[in-house]
Amino acid sequence: MEPLMSFKQKNDYGLHALVILAQYHNIAVSPEEIKHKFDPEGKGIDLVAWLLAAKSFELKAKKVKKSIDRLPFIHLPALIWRDDGQHFILTKIDTQTNRYLIFDLEERNPKVLSAVEFQQVFQGNVILLTSRASIMGKLAKFDFTWFIPAIIKYRKIFVEVMIVSIFLQLFALITPLFFQVVMDKVLVHRGFSTLNVITVALAIVVIFEIVLSGLRTYVFSHSTSRIDVELGAKLFRHLLALPISYFENRRVGDTVARVRELDQIRNFLTGQALTSVLDLLFSFIFFAVMWYYSPKLTIVILLSLPCYIAWSIFISPILRRRLDEKFTRNADNQAFLVESVTAIDTIKALAVTPQMTNIWDKQLASYVSADFRVTVLATIGQQGVQLIQKTVMIINLWLGAHLVISGDLSIGQLIAFNMLSGQVIAPVIRLAQLWQDFQQVGISITRLGDVLNAPTENFQGKLSLPEINGDVTFKNIRFRYKPDAPIILNDVNLTIKQGEVIGIVGRSGSGKSTLTKLLQRFYIPENGQVLIDGHDLALADPNWLRRQIGVVLQDNVLLNRSIRDNIALTDPSMPMEQVIHAAKLAGAHDFISELREGYNTMVGEQGAGLSGGQRQRIAIARALVNNPRILIFDEATSALDYESEHIIMRNMQQICHGRTVIIIAHRLSTVRKADRIIVMEKGHIVERGKHSELLENKDGLYYYLNQLQSI
């Protein structure tokens, strides 16, 4: 095998590895800052300096010795440290094929190595890396323990609920004693006066029991509803704070299905399961009285409890697997349904309704089948519980009758004992019958945790700088969307001056739109810096940045609100004059004025009530209304008719006045008047200059594209 890396730039490998690993943990690191602090002589970062540098960026780094067979159990990605300086990053291990995915720090590309190849380059030194944020994230992850702080928050209410539960158990204890007195004393001695007293007392106990039970349910439901509101609010805030990459890697329907699992948790919190748990916790009160009546009968009841537990343990793994399958099928249905409704125009235009219906029928059948299997297994579980209950009842009846006949127990005591045992067994049976709900809520918490445990965009500690001027610099940019994905941008250097209008053209997939995503801080480059007014965006607060950049895409989404609300989306209290001014700049005021309700016209879902050109002009007005210093047009006019495009281009000079404008376009006519035109090909800038200058190079890509559009 050839050496993994050459020694050409091995001094930079440790530095580059730290930058990449820090970015993985959403921590912006400046290579120049590391060099200045930890490698001032340029000799390369040694191990001690590397660990200190990591610590300075709130990363917890630890060097350990590991054998190859222990690597699958470590937290990845990790840095494989080599004595010769040829370090590399281990990102993933496929234990089935015994292959290793590494990131080559020389070629700056991922590589897949076999076990033999990996063994040749692995020296046993591993640097494990975690961030304090990730450690805190693990401690604060969403699972059953999330509810503990919520319970502590409402501890006074829950203490009151527990006190009420104790009183309910005491009332439940009194009722069997009354029945015993009636059977053993009143009936034998024909004591009508005693019967009347006991009946009145029993009625009072029943009334108190009903009132307390209703009060407990009300208070408990009220508290759990507040927890439900907090969870729902936290979920939505967290969902909106997730990075763009989270949504790009998941289907919309799958995310919706996970969010809908909140309903399952809500039903669990407000249902009978938790009150049954409380009843079970306080049922120990009955055992002392039951033991007083008959130790033998009490032992039978006690022996039945492990049977319920064993049956639940036996059936739980099977039920959980089937619930998992049911969720997966339901998520597939949700995704397909969302996709079908979103693409309804295409489906009808292509007349593929029968094919889509066929797919839906198959997926629906799979879901119904999975749901049926869950129901069957849950029924088997409930019948097993019933079998144990009936068996215990028969044994107690037989044994109790023997004790009565032998004189060890009175009839009243036997009846009272059975009533007491019923109070003990009832919550156990309810919990066993509700075991499916427990399994379901466990699945729901796991699925919802996929959303709530996903790391959000890191805003803490980021700089909120003054209003930007508009100087933009892309410095040595190298970027890919995933570690094992192809390079999208490679060694891109571009400087845009304040107030300059830049056109960016090139074939599809050349990296044009990716540049603007980096400018909006949706992603952090693998290498290099994106600067605005000399400030590294990796260190800037994304919200501060995005509020000062206006963006118009090819397919803009309007919300189901009025035109005014859509234009003033960032500030609903915005003066109407400011809204109208932006609409005039975008060439939208005239057609809005002709509408029946003007600016109060509802646009429909995703702007369905407007034409494509009208939607685009409203989107431009929305981008302009805050007077951004940087404006991005990403294929903003490519889907417009010529009249709508002409209206926008006519106002372009006024729109661009005093701003830095980046126009990405396939139509070269859109960028002809730009101050400079950047031509991109396969992630590189291959040409730059004015329209007339680029046409002079007849071997250039711009000339070729211009000739194609002139035909």
Swiss-Prot record:
GO BP, sorted A to Z: protein secretion by the type I secretion system; proteolysis
Location, primary (coarse class): membrane
Assembly and oligomerization: Homodimer.
Compartmental location: Cell inner membrane
Reaction catalysed by this enzyme: ATP + H2O + proteinSide 1 = ADP + phosphate + proteinSide 2
Domain named Peptidase C39: residues: 1-129
UniProt topology in membrane: Multi-pass membrane protein
Enzyme class: translocase
Domain ABC transporter positions: 472-707
Transmembrane segments: 157-177, 195-215, 273-293, 299-319, 392-412
SUPFAM superfamilies given in the database record: ABC transporter transmembrane region, P-loop containing nucleoside triphosphate hydrolases
Keyword terms, alphabetized: ATP-binding, Cell inner membrane, Cell membrane, Membrane, Nucleotide-binding, Translocase, Transmembrane, Transmembrane helix, Transport
Domain of life: Bacteria
Record carries keyword Transferase: no
Family to which the UniProt record says this protein belongs: Belongs to the ABC transporter superfamily. Protein-1 exporter (TC 3.A.1.109) family.
Range of residues in the leader sequence: none
Free-text note regarding domains: In PaxB the peptidase C39 domain, the ATP-binding domain (NBD) and the transmembrane domain (TMD) are fused.
Protein name in the entry: Exotoxin translocation ATP-binding protein PaxB
GO terms of molecular function: ABC-type transporter activity; ATP binding; ATP hydrolysis activity; ATPase-coupled lipid transmembrane transporter activity; peptidase activity
Record CDD domains: ABC_6TM_CyaB_HlyB_like (cd18588), ABCC_Hemolysin (cd03252), Peptidase_C39_likeA (cd02417)
Keyword Nucleotide-binding recorded: yes
Binding of ATP, residues: 506-513
Biological role: Part of the ABC transporter complex PaxBD involved in PaxA export. Transmembrane domains (TMD) form a pore in the inner membrane and the ATP-binding domain (NBD) is responsible for energy generation.
Enzyme Commission code: 7.4.2.5
